[in-house]
Amino acid sequence: MAHLVWMLGENGEEKSFENPNELLPLSRLEEIGVLYWHLDPKKSESEEELTKIRRERGYSYFDLTEICPDKLENYEEKLKSFYCEHIHADEEIRYCLEGSGYFDVRDKDDKWIRIWIKEGDMIILPAGIYHRFIVDSNNYIKLMRLFIGEPVWTAYNRPQEDHPVRQEYVKNVKGDTGFALAAH
């Protein structure tokens, strides 16, 4: 299982920065409530594992999306929207079936952590975490998006410190309660 997670520079604007100075352990993601799995979309065992994850976490709906100039209408406009720092009121669950891209998430000190997801990587971003997304230099990613119930994809652009979901997230990440984590 290969994962690539690293800190971005002070300004956090390295849209295509692919050469990290120092890789971070997955435990840095767990500290902020981000879950990670690696499944091989070409193996049946991974389908069984995905079914188990969906059942245990209540993900009853999924769809597929391809982010590339030929497949996504208003591609440049959508990329700008994805890259604008935001939160969601629900978890954001993404399973990479093909291609690759970056999810940037804020750590406890409000610094950017970059997660380079590639084929087989599945991540869950907790509700209320500031994040953004951008494709890498391959300019293509095919994702399975999973949801609890009917899909809701409302982005709340930063600042959202008064949003109840953001307040709950901050309480969990900085407080004593922490997150209930179950990934591998």
Curated annotation (Swiss-Prot):
Cofactor binding note of this UniProt entry: Binds either 1 Fe or Ni cation per monomer. Iron-binding promotes an acireductone dioxygenase reaction producing 2-keto-4-methylthiobutyrate, while nickel-binding promotes an acireductone dioxygenase reaction producing 3-(methylsulfanyl)propanoate.
Involved pathway(s): Amino-acid biosynthesis; L-methionine biosynthesis via salvage pathway; L-methionine from S-methyl-5-thio-alpha-D-ribose 1-phosphate: step 5/6
Cited Gene3D superfamilies: Jelly Rolls
GO cellular component terms, semicolon-separated: cytoplasm; nucleus
Catalytic activity entry: 1,2-dihydroxy-5-(methylsulfanyl)pent-1-en-3-one + O2 = 4-methylsulfanyl-2-oxobutanoate + formate + 2 H(+); 1,2-dihydroxy-5-(methylsulfanyl)pent-1-en-3-one + O2 = 3-(methylsulfanyl)propanoate + CO + formate + 2 H(+)
MF term (GO), any: iron ion binding
EC id: 1.13.11.54, 1.13.11.53
SUPFAM superfamilies, sorted: RmlC-like cupins
Main location: cytoplasm
Annotated positions binding Fe(2+): 86, 88, 92, 131
Residues reported in the UniProt entry to bind Ni(2+): 86, 88, 92, 131
Subcellular localization: Cytoplasm; Nucleus
Function: Catalyzes 2 different reactions between oxygen and the acireductone 1,2-dihydroxy-3-keto-5-methylthiopentene (DHK-MTPene) depending upon the metal bound in the active site. Fe-containing acireductone dioxygenase (Fe-ARD) produces formate and 2-keto-4-methylthiobutyrate (KMTB), the alpha-ketoacid precursor of methionine in the methionine recycle pathway. Ni-containing acireductone dioxygenase (Ni-ARD) produces methylthiopropionate, carbon monoxide and formate, and does not lie on the methionine recycle pathway.
HAMAP family referenced in this protein's UniProt entry, alphabetically: Salvage_MtnD_euk
Name of the protein in its database record: Acireductone dioxygenase 4
Organism: Oryza sativa subsp. japonica
Gene: ARD4
